[in-house]
Amino acid sequence: DPDGTSRRRFVERVRRSRTTIGALLMDQKVVAGIGNIYRAELLFRARLDPFVPGRDLTAGMCEEMWEDLVALMTYGARTGRIVTTQPEHRAIEARIVERSRGTRQNGDEDPDVVPREESFYVYHRQTLPCRLCGTTVRSGEIAARTVFWCPRCQSARSRRADWTRQHPAAPWALAEAPAR
C-alpha cells in the first residue's frame, strides 16, 4: 500500500462503525487477511478492549494499529511464523522445556525458532497469567470466533488520553528477520 489508500480506508471504516473493534478486524470489508491470532495479538499490543466500538477509537489509534499490523504480517511473511512477543516477555523456563522436547511452531527444528507457547501474548492463553501484568487472560466470543484478551492491560484505564504508549513489541517486530 505505497500510497496509503488501504490505511485511510481502514481508519475511515473503523471510525464510522458502531461494531466492536474485535468484530471489525475480522470483517474482510474493513481489512483483509487478519485471522484470529493477529486480531487477538494486535488488540493486546494496542491495549484495546476487543468490545470497544470502532467509532470510539481515534484516528491515531487506528493508524498505529495499522502500522503494527503491517509490521507483524511482514515479519510473519518473512519468517513463515506468527510471533508477536518480544524476547524479554517470554518465559525462560518454558523455552528450556520446549527445546528439550524438540518440537517447534510449524515443526521447525531451528533452535532459534520461538516455541509456539512463547509466540503470543494472549492468543489461546485463557486462564494463564498475562505476560505483562499477571492478570488472568480471558476468552469470549466476537463475530462467531473466540477472542482472547487481558482485562487489565486492555481496559479503558490502560490507555492514555493522548495514546502515546509505545507498542510492547514495536522495535522487535520491525527488526530485520531472516528469510525463510
Label each PLM-derived region with a short phrase.
Residues 5-9:
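An acidic intrinsically disordered interaction segment
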Residues 10-180:
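Basic, nucleic-acid-binding surfaces and adjacent catalytic neighborhoods in DNA/RNA-processing proteins
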